[in-house]
């Protein structure tokens, strides 16, 4: 039933009683073992019902986001609600295709009768411990992917966005089978007790410190984890960048959700020759974004709570740099203006701590090589990076700086569609999800072979007593020959030259087909011209 009239009042966060948590997990475990969630139509129906629960509770979701983050309705729809709806639709429309058995590629001829393939099978019970900054967009897609793969789910939303946690509970209650998909609300005690239960996958979005604790706890039972953590994400601006667009897009990255985005930049490395111009563009864009000032803007979120506000303020208080953009704040309303600090030391507080807010460092560099060295020193495995430069410069950054994801000439657009994978690398996390990538994350690819009884003669070689003549006959038929020499160089035998001739000089099948098509068309044209010429000569 629709809740868009807001007649429903969001209750204060209700902590799940500790003595109910184990029973909740046991119930969904029992349901999984019954096989109920393995039915494809059941999974699709659950996701469809979830979609309509999101639609029906849209205004309630907006209200919760306003209360928790002062996130405006526009941004709630843009960055949260529509994203979740699209994830539902994309999954329902494609999951049957994505979940089909996949044949094992490159199977030798003598083994093809065995029908080797991989089958996507559900893992079991998935625990998702969510984050506060995008309470719907970072929670529901994990649930959608896990449901699509046939798992049962336990959701633990963040207590730092309590109104959103209660709306998520309502959405679960209204749309999903409670014996398959359940929730736990609470804080540290509830989370600790959850981690004492046995799960088949644990997903966590948040900071490194908690991520390490969860990984250690999961290791006790060899439970796989999906960790989407943060990082000291760099942005690069070279003298060949479009400075106006770079400023506009990077400022947006620190204004969206008040910069409380795990993929937003922590610092910008700017080529010294364009630093002054780039700073001017940043300040121009600030005035464009917030014509009445950032504090008076109805579009700018607030910091989630006093603890995070004070953490950000401490970073600014501890810097030896100079504020060159913004700088205003109001603790009573948790307002903090997008703020840039020009620093000259990679050990500055603005460079060593993850901001996860609207503040960021800027540092001048003399070359792209210097910028790359700094980025690899500050954090060799960030979650994200943004590169603004020429195509060659951007490629050089991609080749020399590792990150979970990267966007050239814009801000974290690599993760702005629900079809692309989101995930970290190294210290910024492990695993990824969204769309088809959720299928691999929340499934076990089980290898299957079906060996027909009649094929036994093909594999006489394996049976005792072993006989060398049988081995030699098999090797004569099936033994692979290397196409490389002892120095590791590729050899060019008759097969290579035959393929080159048949491919008309192209090493790839597409190129060969295109060349043959051109050849056939050219031959047809020549033949037609020849016919016309013959007719003219016979007149």
From Swiss-Prot:
Matching Gene3D superfamilies: Aldehyde Dehydrogenase, Chain A, domain 1, Aldehyde Dehydrogenase, Chain A, domain 2
Catalytic machinery residues: 228, 262
Lipid biosynthesis found in the keyword field: no
InterPro entries for the chain: Ald_DH/histidinol_DH, Ald_DH_C, Ald_DH_CS_GLU, Ald_DH_N, Aldehyde_DH_dom, Aldehyde_DH_NAD(P)
Keyword Iron-sulfur: no
GO molecular function: aldehyde dehydrogenase (NAD+) activity
Protein family per UniProt: Belongs to the aldehyde dehydrogenase family.
Gene responsible for this protein: carD
EC numbers on record: 1.2.1.82
Any Gene Ontology biological process: carotenoid biosynthetic process
Function: Beta-apo-4'-carotenal oxygenase involved in the last step of synthesis of neurosporaxanthin, a carboxylic apocarotenoid acting as an essential protective pigments and leading to orange pigmentation. Converts the aldehyde beta-apo-4'-carotenal into neurosporaxanthin. Is also able to use shorter apocarotenals as substrates (such as beta-apo-8'-carotenal (C30), beta-apo-10'-carotenal (C27), or the acyclic apocarotenal apo-8'-lycopenal (C30)), indicating wide substrate specificity. Neurosporaxanthin is synthesized from geranyl-geranyl pyrophosphate (GGPP) through several enzymatic activities.
Induction entry: Expression is increased about three-fold after 30 minutes of illumination, and decreased thereafter.
PANTHER family: ALDEHYDE DEHYDROGENASE (PTHR43570:SF11)
Organism: Gibberella fujikuroi (strain CBS 195.34 / IMI 58289 / NRRL A-6831) (Bakanae and foot rot disease fungus)
GO cellular component: a single term: cytoplasm
Reaction catalysed by this enzyme: 4'-apo-beta-carotenal + NAD(+) + H2O = neurosporaxanthin + NADH + 2 H(+)
Full protein name: Beta-apo-4'-carotenal oxygenase
Keyword annotations: Carotenoid biosynthesis, NAD, Oxidoreductase
Stretches of the chain forming a coiled coil according to its record: none
